[in-house]
Amino acid sequence: MALKRKDFLGLYNVEADEINEILDTAQAMKEIFTRTVKKVPTLRGKTIINLFFEPSTRTKSSFDIAAKRLSADVMSISKSSSSVAKGETLLDTARTLEVMGADVVVVRHSAPGAARFLAENLSASVLNAGDGAHAHPTQALLDMYTIKEKMGKIEGLNVLIIGDIAHSRVARSNIWGLTKLGARVRVVGPGTLIPRDIEEMGVEVYRDLDEALEGVDVVNILRIQLERQQKGLFPSIREYRHFYGMNEVRLRKLEDRALVMHPGPMNRGIEIESIVADGEQSVITEQVTNGVAIRMALLYLLAGREINDEDLA
């Protein structure tokens, strides 16, 4: 079944049934990973353009692999390799690629709303791979997929997000998605990094990490953006690590079944200690693997194809 929309820009306007459809499709896609030949002809003849104007390893590589496993033709373009470096506008670049036959444009940009701007001006489908501090829907979806895969459900779980909530597109997208699927979401971090209106999104705000950890099923640790410290939004790296770093002592406060997540890249020794990142409760590597499945699912659904045995053979 195809998505109900031309573009996929965020989770703020996506209903629970559509989120579940994406997660179910990702489950079907992940089965392909177990095959000797990890490729299906589903999107043969389709062209996917990955337009990345911000540095990325995981997301960009994940979209590349996802498109290729579906047999799509894929081209990846960075800011430095595009005519934007020569002064061309984002829209002119995207329109040029569209008239060359792009079916889906995957875009990452530092400006909030960049993906929506392209979606309103292109006939090709636009998939948001992160726009400023606004949204990162595919990261939230792979996080939700990982939680559901490991815990068997999302509804009723207590999920804690730690760190810079104010500037995190990952946090915002996770909150939108998790609350729609019935999870109870908590956030914790320095007061300067917690938006004043965050409770309006249906979350519970904590100031003390040790208190916030009580009774949680999932801990999602955000990368601390070190440039924020230079702007005085928190006193020092050492103080942040002391009050908000996930270490072995805090790990012991969790139940054995609780999950530890991180969207990457990690600042080991700051927001997360290696013993936590590499421990038995960590599902960080699974998040990366599941990212490919989620992005395959979205590319597949945006192309408007129906799931059947022939497509996945």
From Swiss-Prot:
Q: Which residues bind carbamoyl phosphate?
A: 58-59, 108, 136, 139, 264-265
Which biological pathway?
Pyrimidine metabolism; UMP biosynthesis via de novo pathway; (S)-dihydroorotate from bicarbonate: step 2/3
Q: Name one GO cellular component term.
A: cytosol
Which Gene3D superfamilies does UniProt cross-reference here?
A: Aspartate/ornithine carbamoyltransferase (3.40.50.1370)
Extract the InterPro entries matched here.
Asp/Orn_carbamoyltranf_P-bd (IPR006132), Asp/Orn_carbamoylTrfase (IPR006130), Asp/Orn_carbamoylTrfase_sf (IPR036901), Asp_carbamoyltransf (IPR002082), Asp_carbamoyltransf_Asp/Orn-bd (IPR006131)
Q: Name one GO biological process term.
A: amino acid metabolic process
Q: Which domain of life is it from?
A: Bacteria
One of this protein's Pfam families, by short name? OTCace_N
The GO molecular function terms of this record are: amino acid binding; aspartate carbamoyltransferase activity
Query: What EC designation does it have?
Result: 2.1.3.2
**Keywords per UniProt:** Pyrimidine biosynthesis, Transferase
Please state what class of enzyme this protein is: transferase
**Reactions performed catalytically:** carbamoyl phosphate + L-aspartate = N-carbamoyl-L-aspartate + phosphate + H(+)
Functional note: Catalyzes the condensation of carbamoyl phosphate and aspartate to form carbamoyl aspartate and inorganic phosphate, the committed step in the de novo pyrimidine nucleotide biosynthesis pathway.
- Name the family the entry cites: Belongs to the aspartate/ornithine carbamoyltransferase superfamily. ATCase family.
Under PANTHER family, the record lists: ASPARTATE CARBAMOYLTRANSFERASE, ORNITHINE CARBAMOYLTRANSFERASE, MITOCHONDRIAL
Q: What HAMAP family does this protein map onto?
A: Asp_carb_tr (MF_00001)
This protein's name: Aspartate carbamoyltransferase catalytic subunit
Identify the species of origin.
Answer: Halothermothrix orenii (strain H 168 / OCM 544 / DSM 9562)
Gene that this sequence comes from:
pyrB
